[in-house]
């Protein structure tokens, strides 16, 4: 099966997120089209220029080098997922950005106090969004909301983890444990997060930055530290969609639910540029980070989400 979603509005277009989720598929390139085959049978084809993310969730997939190179040249992210939709690897384009070298130098020279202030603001916004989700789901939210006001520079008291423990037990019950290797709810969360993370990594590369140089995440084995930093505040959007499914007795990673999670990228948020879909707000956020590093004056264009998700989720 191939899942392919495309959306266009008056200002911007996020091209298709193409998922290959069945075994024994061969992905090749022909005359500007990405072609999906099983043996010699063509199952489908998508214009190369229409793809923004190639998501490989099946394990028995063969992809030609020509496809990977061409996708990278088109600023497309390729995501390789393991069991339960945990992303294990992303293939990232090296953007031909006019200020690529300068931006990376600014990343390297970014001061610790500056990064700690950025992380503080990220954590505050994430916790506020978590409190909003609890409120919308008619759960106790005021204590989580209060925690957001207690976050210090660099979150030295680890208020993020404290809020998370309260958040998950309130949202899905005391017996729920967030486990990336888990099934059911956890697998749905993994899938949604993988899509968000890939979109954020694409915005980072488009801005002439390298995702390995994070603000707070610094695991030596993680090549996407900066993407993991900046997509934290978007996680609660996925959480709410998964909660809506779960509350109706549905926690299967079905084609319908995958499409609902992918469509989260088109949920409207408020930015300094006006109302924007999530994926576009990521570009605004990362560009504001680039400008803040350059000017050494922190002014990030954080997306403000009002909790609205489309009715067809």
Where are these regions (language model features)?
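Active-site helix-to-loop segments that bind/position phosphate- or nucleotide-bearing substrates
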Residues: 2-10, 15-18, 24-25, 46, ...
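N-terminal ordered "arm"
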Residues: 21-65
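N-terminal transmembrane hairpin
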Residues: 53-55, 62-98
